[in-house]
Amino acid sequence: MELKFSTFLSLTLLFSSVLNPALSDLCNPDDKKVLLQIKKAFGDPYVLASWKSDTDCCDWYCVTCDSTTNRINSLTIFAGQVSGQIPALVGDLPYLETLEFHKQPNLTGPIQPAIAKLKGLKSLRLSWTNLSGSVPDFLSQLKNLTFLDLSFNNLTGAIPSSLSELPNLGALRLDRNKLTGHIPISFGQFIGNVPDLYLSHNQLSGNIPTSFAQMDFTSIDLSRNKLEGDASVIFGLNKTTQIVDLSRNLLEFNLSKVEFPTSLTSLDINHNKIYGSIPVEFTQLNFQFLNVSYNRLCGQIPVGGKLQSFDEYSYFHNRCLCGAPLPSCK
């Protein structure tokens, strides 16, 4: 009798879940409600077609659920045609660890202030959009961020110095915007990790902070700005820097006086006002890429290492640089 009742109960629950899928949903109902409101705010775009009220939101495209809590922990809308501003509703997904809007040319307006509510956020990527306005100071409140990418937008104004207060940041991308002003001095005083730093293709001016001498950047790209003066503070014999791009600025310093880390594999300093000679220590470095063209360098290119593996375009248009792969010195 007990076996029959147990079988009957199991069948009843099975048929109930078939007739009412909501009973078998893993998705948290509060999260589902917020997601459906986000879909509506974006005008029901095709990329969110799988977001239907009668299905489990843990199975929806562009979202993932935590395997233990079943709360939405990732919202990633990539290369789909969503239009308008980022809805404030994104701040009502309290368990988000990843938020991404990427390659959304019709996404406009400022960076949504409600994002500051997402204290558990680890990765924020708002890139290749038409977002405008400033880089907001409130981003420094997201202490769990390990990755911040605001590249390829229309952001303007100064870079907030408070971003150096993000203790877990592994990479900071602000490249390909319209940012102005100086690089914050505080970027030479990151309180935790030293992040890979990408500030290229902006309108930044002034000197590179001397505090950078204290930072050991693995990768740093400051190219295509209006930076002036001495960039030697980026380098150092005891650092572990691998990739440096300072090209197309107004930098002016003596290359032969710089101590370079043995870890350096890529150096691009083309189109500056850098003078001196190419250090003989370059023959000891395992360069995968090198470009020192369009500067004011003189003297013979040292022979050895990888230096002769690069063509003349890596060296030409200097004041009096000579030797292979350029013409012989006279």
UniProtKB/Swiss-Prot annotation:
The keyword Phosphoprotein does not apply. Mostly expressed in fruits, and, to a lower extent, in flowers and leaves. It comes from the Eukaryota. Residues 1-24 form the signal peptide. N-linked glycosylated. Homodimer. This is Polygalacturonase inhibitor. It comes from Pyrus communis. The gene is PGIP.
